[in-house]
């Protein structure tokens, strides 16, 4: 049980770092980044739309 919780926390921290890095290091505005959902999450994020509306191999919005 403890291991499962640890993995969950590590994943959460990693996601936070990745999204913060995208928001501040990206060339796009923070607002656009924030409403963009990565393809590997299936495009079903609670914070925004899919980055790739025409499919994962299509152009990024």
Swiss-Prot record:
Disulfide bonds: 36-51, 37-45, 39-56
MF term (GO), any: sodium channel inhibitor activity
Signal peptide (residue range): 1-20
Prosequence residues removed at maturation: 21-31
Superkingdom, taxonomy of origin: Eukaryota
Keywords attached to this entry: Disulfide bond, Nematocyst, Neurotoxin, Secreted, Signal, Toxin
Principal location: secreted
Cell compartments where the protein resides: Secreted; Nematocyst
Cellular component annotations (GO), alphabetically ordered: extracellular region; nematocyst
Record keyword Disulfide bond present: yes
Free-text function comment from the UniProt entry: Sodium channel inhibitor. 5 uM completely inhibits voltage-gated sodium channel (Nav) inactivation.
Family in the record: Belongs to the sea anemone short toxin (type III) family.
Name used for this protein in its record: Delta-actitoxin-Avd2c
Species this protein is from: Anemonia viridis (Snakelocks anemone)
Lineage: Eukaryota, Metazoa, Cnidaria, Anthozoa, Hexacorallia
């Amino acid at each position: 049980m403890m291991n499962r919780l640890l993995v969950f926390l590590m994943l959460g921290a990693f996601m936070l770092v990745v999204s913060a890095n995208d928001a501040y290091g990206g060339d796009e505005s923070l607002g656009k980044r924030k409403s963009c959902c990565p393809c590997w999450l299936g495009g079903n994020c609670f914070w925004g739309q899919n980055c790739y509306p025409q499919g994962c191999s299509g152009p990024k919005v």
